[in-house]
Amino acid sequence: MRLCVLIVLLFATPALAQDRRAGDFDYYVLALSWSPNWCATTGDARGSDQCNARHDHGWILHGLWPQYHRGWPQFCQSGKQPPSRSQTHAMTDIMGSPGLAWHQWKKHGTCSGFDASGYFALSRAAYARITRPAAFRKLNETVRLPARVVEAAFLKANKGLEPDGITITCKQGHIAEARICLSGDLQFVPCGADVVRDCRDERALFTPVR
């Protein structure tokens, strides 16, 4: 009997997931990455052009991710045409690289219910929806700070954004991302339990814009 129950549990979730079509989800997660920190932990080692000082990147768009209240869809069979090279290159001003734009479409955009043009347009609108705290661009040296300071700055800069609607992540001792939860019409909403996992680092590194 226990074996039967275990088998049901193991196979129930994928079956339910298959019933969810592209465009059928609960809310979005907008992921903003602090580019200088990504470059320090990952990009410099890759020789990424995103890290060239001429770009002056601060908070860039990592992606706009369809989300369930528990879990998330990815790599959906949408039947939509993939983006053209010109479409992915057009996103580099806010995403840093055409490769990231392509990957985000393939992994997350295919689950949005939009075609590539619509998904990128919505991603750009979501990015513009958020006021990115200006104080971080004024840094002229690397500092250590609690992750909660970054969260507080976003809360102060964005009227209507509540603590349960944002989470700050860290990677390799650096502030990595601000993740903000939005409705389909880009209003602030609470994040699900699997999204709200704040970084607890009290001395996270934050490097200045290059």
Residue ranges and their predicted role:
Residues 29-33, 43-210:
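Domain-level detector of nuclease and nuclease-like folds
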Residues 12-14:
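N-terminal signal peptide c-region/cleavage motif recognized by signal peptidases
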Residues 18-41:
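N-terminal module-boundary/linker segments of secreted carbohydrate-active enzymes
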Residues 8-10, 21, 171:
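Sterically constrained small-residue positions within well-ordered secondary structures
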Residues 1-7:
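Sec-dependent signal peptide recognition
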